[in-house]
Amino acid sequence: MILSRVRVLLLVLFTTVALYGASETHVVIMHTNDIRGHVLPEPDAGGSARLATLVRDVKPDLMLDAGEMFSGTLISDLFLGAPVIQVMNTIGYDAASVGANEFSFGIHALAARAREANFPMLSANAESPIGEIQVAAIFNAQDVRIAVIGLTSEELMRTGRPQNVKYVDVADVVSTLETVLPRVRGRADCIVLLTNVSRADERRLARAFPEVRLIIGAHDDAELPVRVGATTIVSAGKFGKYVGKVDLTFNDGKLNRIESGLIPLEGVQPDPAIEKILEPYEAKLNKALQQVLGHAVGDLSRSTAQESHIGNLLADAVRAKTGTAIALINAADPQAGIRKGPITSRTVLEVLPSENTLVTMRLNGAQIKRILGRTVMSLSGVRVKLDVTKPEGKRLVSARLQDGTPIRDKDFYSVTTNDYLVTGGDGYKEFSEGISVEDTGILVRDALGEYIARLGVVQPRLDGRIQFSR
């Protein structure tokens, strides 16, 4: 038994009064959440190959995932989550709930992954054209009927990219369960919620439905289980560094005791079968990252305090991609400069590791000036003069379009920025006040890569688009 040789973290026992003399049955559930594409191992922790070994040794009756499976690593993002589903199939998952992360590549990709899965993907409250998503699944484990119901966070409608959730609607979790429970209650001995919702919603569910004795949720922290009334709420941390284990004890078909804990994957021997599955994906990924897009004839510097080579290149790339009059990107978005020599796909990824997308909108001149007066930005299509001795918000001395025309307060201009700034990043409320807003779904780094490939030869360029008054 794996528990005899692998350290168990945070083992917690919740017990009700034992039914002496009654027939006792144990159902073991293992669970994960927030994998986010982390199928490859990190230094001595995590990775699907280690998880496969644990699952093989423990031999759980049910293997479940509470969502946030796909986006978050290159190997998953490049193949739209396909490697994740393939290893989950091999490990032997029985069901997974649908989280916001599963919509990262759009509903068509989600539908494809759901078709590839050898297990049901569940959401009782997310309505979409994807027929492959189920409300619930019922399993027979040790002659105990276990109903597993999936729930998705309503936050999906706020945080999901508009083009990815255009045809999706997420209902309230409590009202949804009020409708779903009567349909499964008579068909199950035990109801388990597999949720990708907030902690507050988990507690609401536990208080509203005390007959639900176990909620398997999705939270980043590796934390102690929570008890709300008779309901136990568990999760297993992020990136597959731990796997959760729940032991349900039934006496004469009634749930009597719940034991739950986390098992770290550190030190577990990887399963060669999973490593073999991932090898071709790794090879294709490495080949893609080695692709040469262009050549830099000199070093391209990065700066958040003044005009920079990489900032100019990025802003010009963004504006070229969308065709707007102006591009405004936070100067801290590029995480690195570019050294003289070949520029590869890996170089672009190092410059822009985030998943930010391009958003177009129309802003009036007064809004643009307020943005420009706060701090230095990477910009294109506009030239500014700043006085950094003034307080933040009052630093703008002048702002003109590229042709020298002054930006007028009441005129409207087409602008491209990124979704980070539109959703309030760095405190720029003006971007959230734009009109004709469209999230293009185009990754900022893809726009940069395409622009570099089009140029072929990249010159470090400072042209005075940001100047400082003396």
Predicted regions and their residues:
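Bacterial N-terminal signal peptides
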Residues: 8-18
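C-terminal catalytic subdomain
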Residues: 341-380
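Glycine-rich phosphate/diphosphate-binding loops and the adjacent beta-loop-alpha structural elements
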Residues: 288-309
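N-terminal secretory signal peptides that target proteins for export/translocation
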Residues: 1-4
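Low-complexity, glycine/alanine/valine/leucine- and proline-rich hydrophobic stretches
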Residues: 397-421, 442
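A glycine-rich phosphate-binding loop feature that marks nucleotide/adenosyl-phosphate handling sites
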Residues: 262-265, 295-301, 328-338, 383-391, ...
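Short conserved micro-motifs at the rims of enzyme active sites and ligand-binding pockets
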Residues: 269-272, 339-341, 371-374, 396-397, ...
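Acidic, metal/ion-coordinating pockets
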Residues: 21-284, 303-317, 321, 327, ...
